[in-house]
UniProtKB/Swiss-Prot annotation:
Protein name in UniProt: Lipoyl synthase, mitochondrial
Domain Radical SAM core: 145-366
HAMAP family for this protein: Lipoyl_synth
UniProt pathway: Protein modification; protein lipoylation via endogenous pathway; protein N(6)-(lipoyl)lysine from octanoyl-[acyl-carrier-protein]: step 2/2
Single GO BP term: lipoate biosynthetic process
Keyword set includes Heme: no
Chain positions covered by the region annotation Disordered: 31-51
UniProt lineage: Eukaryota, Fungi, Dikarya, Ascomycota, Pezizomycotina
UniProt cofactor note: Binds 2 [4Fe-4S] clusters per subunit. One cluster is coordinated with 3 cysteines and an exchangeable S-adenosyl-L-methionine.
Chief subcellular location: mitochondrion
Enzyme class (EC, first level): transferase
Record localization: Mitochondrion
EC id: 2.8.1.8
């Protein structure tokens, strides 16, 4: 009992302190009532006004709501429409001015059912695509269309690691990538026949660690696809096989419909843009060899703009490509994948892309796709079917067949 009494007294002794705290708390809460207490009134008179924010200052300095709704949709002139905007980025005291991505280069985030289905199939068969590895901005367009037969998939063969390190490309690099998957040709053909695509693009990483550069693996994949889906159109976007033209001929005779090899940029900028093992003249020889090996093939190449090239350099590149009998050329805007890669020298406007498209057609190219978001395989099926195959078949009265009988690797190498 003595212990409990002393404990009770200690609780009573602390009550005056707790009452003071409670009274103070109540007086603070009464600040919001219609009749504030004297202490609350004195506190409110000494409180300073909140500082105006930068956002509010900018908002008040801009047009009024009446101005916003009253001007209508006045069209912008080209200089206003293509004006680049900048922003200050970084911590206080170390901010840097960065050029914002132009509006004509912005694309939607992919989320369609077709996109999810293709991605699931690819992971299940352990296949890679350049669409994902190279962070292509058009993946929602190429994979997300409602019409499967018009969709385009770009399968990347021989793994996801390249032996070269071009300064514009985000694909992983290594001197010793993983060995080839012997089941990849069969898996690729199975996936493509399952999807019901009308057009497929096969590309690959460079494999300088292999004696043939992976050419036989490439050719075998084409043959498997043609066996499972004879009506599908196949485009092969290959490397230069270190200049081994016999390997180029092997792939060209494997049964494909389009042989593509990208020169990437003009000759003068090639040493700064591409890996040291690649050069412009070697790429020209690859395209010539493919055409000579199978004259019925469509040959195709692509150039990136915005790297610092001049008009004269572009003219020279196009002349050399036409001299090599290249049929199709595409122009697209270079977009820096990460801060480790080459910076963008210039954002080329859509009007300039249209100008170069007209120039290429005037020079005799069979077809030219040109635009900020155009990539070498962007909507390749649509462009090829509508602008190349149909044109050729109409000229020949519908009797021409593009492509050749698939053969074995042994037949090709004999």
């Amino acid at each position: 009992m003595a212990v409990s009494t002393s404990h009770f007294r200690s609780l009573c002794a602390s009550r005056p302190l707790s009452r003071t705290a409670i009274v103070g708390h109540i007086s603070c809460r009464s600040y919001a009532t219609t009749e504030p207490s004297p202490s609350a009134t004195s506190t409110s008179t000494t409180t300073t006004a909140r500082r105006r924010t930068t956002f509010k200052d900018k908002l008040n300095a801009g047009p009024s709501f009446a101005d916003f709704v009253g001007n209508g949709n006045t069209p912008l002139d080209p200089s206003e429409a293509y004006a680049l905007k900048t922003a200050l980025v970084g911590p206080a005291g170390r901010k840097k001015e960065m050029t914002r991505l132009p509006s004509w280069l912005k694309t939607p985030i992919p989320d369609s059912k077709n996109y999810q289905r293709l991605k699931k199939d690819l992971r299940g068969l352990n296949l890679h695509t350049v669409c994902e590895e190279a962070r292509c901005p058009n993946i929602s367009d190429c994979w997300g269309g409602s019409d499967k037969s018009a969709a385009t998939a770009t399968i990347m063969l021989m793994g996801d690691t390249c032996t070269r390190g071009c300064r514009f490309c985000s694909v992983k690099t290594s001197r010793t990538p993983a060995p080839l998957d012997p089941h990849e040709p069969e898996n690729t053909a199975e996936a493509i026949s399952r999807w019901g695509l009308g057009y497929v693009v096969l590309t690959s990483v460079d494999r300088d660690d292999l004696a043939d550069g992976g050419a036989r693996h490439f050719a075998e994949t084409v043959m498997k696809i043609k066996q499972k889906a004879p009506s599908i159109l196949v485009e092969c976007l290959t490397g230069d096989y270190a200049g081994d033209l016999e390997m180029v001929k092997l792939v060209a005779r494997s049964g494909l419909d389009v042989y593509a090899h990208n020169v990437e940029t003009v000759e003068a900028l090639t040493p700064q843009v591409r890996d040291r093992r690649a050069n412009f003249q070697q790429s020209i020889r690859v395209l010539e060899a493919a055409k000579n090996a199978q004259p019925s093939l469509i040959t195709k190449t692509s150039l990136m703009l915005g790297l610092g090239e001049t008009d004269d350099q572009l003219w020279d590149a196009l002349r050399q490509l036409r001299a090599a009998n290249v049929d199709v050329v595409t122009f697209g805007q270079y977009m820096r994948p990460t801060k480790r890669h080459m910076a963008v020298h210039e954002y080329v406007t859509p009007d300039r892309f249209e100008l170069w498209r007209q120039r290429a057609l005037d020079m005799g190219f069979l077809y030219c796709a040109s635009g900020p978001l155009v990539r070498s395989s962007y909507k390749a099926g649509e462009a090829f079917i509508e602008n190349v195959l149909k044109k050729r078949r109409a000229t020949s009265g519908g009797t021409e067949t593009v492509g050749v009988r698939p053969v074995t690797v042994d037949e090709v190498t004999r």
